[in-house]
Structure formats: structure tokens, C-alpha cells
Amino acid sequence: MSYSIGIDYGTASGRVFLINTTNGQVVSKFVKPYTHGVIESELNGLKIPHTYALQNSNDYLEIMEEGISYIVRESKIDPDNIVGIGIDFTSSTIIFTDENLNPVHNLKQFKNNPHAYVKLWKHHGAYKEAEKLYQTAIENNNKWLGHYGYNVSSEWMIPKIMEVMNRAPEIMEKTAYIMEAGDWIVNKLTNKNVRSNCGLGFKAFWEEETGFHYDLFDKIDPKLSKVIQDKVSAPVVNIGEAVGKLDDKMAQKLGLSKETMVSPFIIDAHASLLGIGSEKDKEMTMVMGTSTCHLMLNEKQHQVPGISGSVKGAIIPELFAYEAGQSAVGDLFEYVAKQAPKSYVDEAENRNMTVFELMNEKIKHQMPGESGLIALDWHNGNRSVLSDSNLTGCIFGLTLQTKHEDIYRAYLEATAFGTKMIMQQYQDWHMEVEKVFACGGIPKKNAVMMDIYANVLNKKLIVMDSEYAPAIGAAILGAVSGGAHNSINDAVDAMKEPILYEINPEAEKVQRYETLFKAYKALHDIHGYKKANIMKDIQSLRVEG
């Protein structure tokens, strides 16, 4: 009997799972919020700009060390039977280190410098740099930009590197290596300096055939090319391969065998496809958490406007993986719950239920359009298909009779409409969608929301019985790297999560949502394309820290 470890680094917390490689059984699990959380408003008592989202990398090591110690102790499994470790991580979450892989934010002189810290995926401080990258690529007719949806996001690695070069050159001077945080964990485990094809391909303008696009970097700033070459470039390990064995000192520290193999890191949402068993084309998977990623696989590389990228072999060898997404989903619902009137909070408490459960109860019998509201779910910008992190949310149709649960439902529907925009974009560019999977904590807990999605998308929705699909997917890669299975496909077949339930669309609701979607699309196009300056002009009045 063999086992593998899957370590899942999310936005707010980390998870360590011990999985049976034969049947996918969860033997033990450890879940812990990051000690320092997400650093968004202030750093060590100092105010930082509202576009920033940072983290402390020491939290990641804490999760790994405490988590592995716990699952080995709690499961009583012989460490010699743990054959592999897989890592998934939010992305693009990047870290700056010295030559010994020590993060520069741990240096005393940079303790209060936000640019020394981990830049979380939803850090939008590099929006000016992203715009410069995009304009330069367009001016130079870089055709490969189509592999990234003809857009550049401030959430990606290269704009964030440019941000540090421009605003904190003293940090760059002390930095020996720049990498995805997922790569950093892998390198700490193995004492190597490698990069995953998944992270580089989706977030750093790297392609298997051509490598980095230095021609573009040179036109922006020759110094940028040198930074990429000296600090980012490293041997690349593909998903499905092994990086190597645990470093001896790390094995001793973690209480594991030094024969334990480590796989390259995979982006967290991408790991979910493996965890739920989506291995084919014509299947769209929604990985739903603080944000939502919409993932597909295809044998060909199509240039789909507005998506976040397409990379060969980033999930399944020989297939192109496609990613699109929405920047605020779970975060948006949490925002609405926090705005609930005191009477709702008190009622929920008296009835021993959450505010979410109370609001779901209040809206579950409403028909589409009953509230008269429609919203744009851009509270954290729009990732797909507009690729504009500077857009903001709106709600239309408010009256003096509007109730809080009506607003909540409007936001649920808005995220479903945003998903439909993405699904239609895939289909318009020769990628048919026959099945839609939903995984994550939100789908499992919120059947009302899933009913809305099934009817908005007019597709059968398959909800998976897993809040932790990324951790399962990471463990699958760990099992492959450790030799428990001969291929990713074999490991997926043995270890994937089961289906929880399926929802079929209802004709009357579908028809009503078609009418609402036309209104949503009109507002989307007005405020996203034609009059996008309205939101941005308002935001420009905010005082930057």
C-alpha cells in the first residue's frame, strides 16, 4: 500500500492531504489559515495602496511543516510508504529570494517595504506595467499574444517583476531568483532551482518551443530581458514528470523518507481537473472559490480572445490546457454577507444557521427576474473576457423595496452570467462545451446557486463531492512522480473524486434567464467596452497610498 501527499496553497489558507494512491481515499488532512493572512490594507502598521495584495512566505513553510507532521502522526502511516509529494498553488503568486532561496522580505532592511513581499495572484499594483506590456506587444504585432487571449493581466508574473524594477530597484538588486511561490516550495523541498511548465507557460510568456519572448522584453527595457534571463530562467520540469527526491535535510525535518519524490508545482485550479477526473475535451470545469477558474482541454491551440492562456501539457501531457476566469466569486458573496442588516444576522444566529443559509432560504423560490435587479460582478476587476482589472462592480434596478436577499441573488446571477460569457467565448472559437463540472466548497454547500448556474448556462451541471479537489490533484501528481502509477491518466482513474449530484436545466427558467442575459450582455458591453472610462474616472478620484 502506498500513499502520496498533496499540499494545496489557496488564497487564505493551506491544506495538506495524505491520500491512498490505490483508491484516492483521504487518509488524513490538515487545514490552517495563513498566520498573516492576505496583506491588503496595511503592512506592519503602514498603509499600502488599495490595489495591493501581499503575503508572508513564512506562512507557506508553516503550513508544509505543521501539516506534514500532523498527517503522518495522525494517520500512523509508515513514512517509507509515502512515495510522493505534489504541490498546487495560487498563481501568479510570485516571490523574490536571495541566492539561498531565502525571501528578501525576511531581510531587516526590507521589513516594511511591500515590494519585498510575496505578490499574491490578486495583487493589481502592476496595472500600468501590464498596459505597457500589452501596448508594446500590439505595436510590434506579436502574434503569440493570441495564446494569452490577446491581453496582458496585471496579475501575471512579468508585470509584477516590472513593478518592482520600476518602484523598488533596491529590492531587485538584492534578488537572486524570482519564481512562482509554488516553484519556491518545490525548490525548498528538493534543494534545486527549477521551474514548472505550468506556471511559466500561463503566467510568464514562456512557450515550450520558443522559451521566453525576449524580443518583446528588449523593446520594453533591455534590463527586463536580463532580469528574466538571470533571475527567472531555470531548468523546466513538465507536469507528469518528477523534480527529484526530497533533500536529505528536508526529509529529516519533515519526518519523511529521503526516497520520497517531488513533482513540479501545478496551478491550484488546474490541479482540480485532475482531482475530479476531467481529462477530455468538450468539458468545462469551474473551480469555484474566492475566484472562479474556467478550464478546458483541447488537442489544438486556438487563439481565444479574452482568456488567460493556453499551454501544452500544463495539465495532461500532449493536450493544450485553457484557462479563463472571474476575479471575484466567493469574495463577492462574502462581501454581500458582511453587508447583511443586523436583523438578518440576528435571525440567522437565533435559528442556528449562517447568513448565507438564511439568504438562500429567502431566494430559493424566486423566479428569475422577480427582483428586478441585475449586476456586474466586477468588484475585483474583470479577468475574462474583458481582461481589465480596473473595472468595478455595478448593480442596476434598485428601488426602495429592494431587499438584501435580492441583492445577494443578483450577484449570484451575475457570476453565472459572467461564466456564460466565458463559455460562449470558448464555443465561438471552436471549443464545444458538452459537459460542465463544478468543484470547490461553494458548489458543494450552495445548491441554490448551482440551480441558477444550470439554468443560466442551459447545461447539465455536474457537482463534484469535493471541497479539496486541488489537493487531490496535487496528490495525484505526487503519486505519479513516486511511481505509484505509470501515467497521469492511470492515477486520475484510480484517485479522482466522486460526483455529488447533477442538476438539469428547466425550460421556463432557461427562457427567463435568456432575457436577463441579454440585459447583462448589453450592460457588460457598455461598461466594459463602450463607456469603460466611466468607472475608471470615478476610481481615479481615490487617493492612492
From Swiss-Prot:
Listed pathway(s): Carbohydrate degradation; L-arabinose degradation via L-ribulose; D-xylulose 5-phosphate from L-arabinose (bacterial route): step 2/3
Any one annotated GO CC term: cytoplasm
GO biological process, one term: L-arabinose catabolic process to xylulose 5-phosphate
Keywords: Arabinose catabolism, ATP-binding, Carbohydrate metabolism, Kinase, Nucleotide-binding, Transferase
CDD domains xref list: ASKHA_NBD_FGGY_L-RBK
Documented EC number(s): 2.7.1.16
Catalytic activity: D-ribulose + ATP = D-ribulose 5-phosphate + ADP + H(+); L-ribulose + ATP = L-ribulose 5-phosphate + ADP + H(+)
Source domain of life: Bacteria
Entries under Pfam families matching the protein: FGGY_C, FGGY_N
GO molecular function: ATP binding; D-ribulokinase activity; ribulokinase activity
Intrachain S-S bonds: none
SUPFAM superfamilies: Actin-like ATPase domain
UniProt family annotation: Belongs to the ribulokinase family.
Protein's name in the database: Ribulokinase
Organism, as annotated: Staphylococcus aureus (strain NCTC 8325 / PS 47)
Gene from which the chain derives: araB
